[in-house]
């Protein structure tokens, strides 16, 4: 009952004000069914990239950062939005393959310069390579560094949040110039979109439309938002 049924879900594209902690829905798109995606010779992630590309001109006037949950922390999506000049703020799985970046002197030996300097072990973190973050209201402790993601094949601004129970969460931005504080603030602000969905369901009939035609459904979703 709680599983995702492609073709019966919608993708919401919204603008979030991190400082005011508010959200405004811009557009909703119905996710194509698996059959329709197959006919288009694309997958769900490619569909999401195409939707973003449709609004990139207007979005780029406001921001160059897209925030999304861990589902989108894959190379296909990161590379796809990079083509449209967007960076991603998201979360890695807790066991992500991440490496310290080598910052020492360049060797005079021939060949490719050394880039990686050991895998990040989450049970034995090297805090000398990190900067501790001081974030009001955050339980536990948080550290930031520039790390290399094997999955994304690129450097990222990484934030490691160590919770009071000893477990950790990994947040990142593909915009390495972004501060660790901003990575956390931006990722946490993405939950504001849930209030847009909640209000549309409770007050403006988001789930009440019984139409079957795609255009009618599209109008109903966006009118609700």
Model-flagged regions — what are they?
Residues 1, 13, 65-72, 88, ...:
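Short, conserved catalytic/metal-binding motifs centered on acidic residues
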Residues 1-28, 158:
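Acidic, metal-ligating active-site segments
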Residues 25, 77-79, 100-102, 157, ...:
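A short secondary-structure junction signal
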Residues 33-157:
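An internal, acidic/charged active-site-proximal segment
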Residues 46-50, 170-176, 181:
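Short, motif-level signal for alpha-helix interfacial/capping segments enriched in acidic residues
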Residues 180-211:
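Short amphipathic alpha-helical "interface-anchor" segments enriched in bulky aromatics
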Residues 209-225:
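Basic, amphipathic alpha-helical segments enriched in Lys/Arg and hydrophobic/aromatic residues
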């Amino acid at each position: 009952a709680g599983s995702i049924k492609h073709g019966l879900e919608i993708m919401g594209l919204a603008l979030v004000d991190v400082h005011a902690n508010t959200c405004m829905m811009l557009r909703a798109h119905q996710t194509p069914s698996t059959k329709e995606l197959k006919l288009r010779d694309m997958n769900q992630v490619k569909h999401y990239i195409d939707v973003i590309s449709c609004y990139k001109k207007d979005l780029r006037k406001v921001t160059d950062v897209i925030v999304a949950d861990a589902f989108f922390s894959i190379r296909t999506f990161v590379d796809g939005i990079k083509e449209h000049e967007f960076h991603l703020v998201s979360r890695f799985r807790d066991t992500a393959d991440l490496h310290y970046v080598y910052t020492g002197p360049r060797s005079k030996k021939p060949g490719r310069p050394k880039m990686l300097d050991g895998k990040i072990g989450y049970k034995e973190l090297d805090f000398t390579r990190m900067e501790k973050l001081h974030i009001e209201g955050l339980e536990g402790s948080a550290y930031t560094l520039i790390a290399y993601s094997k999955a994304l094949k690129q450097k990222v601004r990484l934030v490691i949040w160590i919770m009071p129970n000893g477990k950790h969460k990994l947040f990142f931005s593909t915009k390495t110039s972004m501060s660790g504080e901003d990575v956390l603030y931006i990722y946490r602000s993405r939950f504001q979109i849930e209030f847009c969905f909640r209000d549309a369901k409770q007050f403006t009939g988001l789930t009440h439309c019984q139409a079957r035609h795609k255009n009618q459904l599209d109008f109903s979703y966006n009118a609700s938002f």
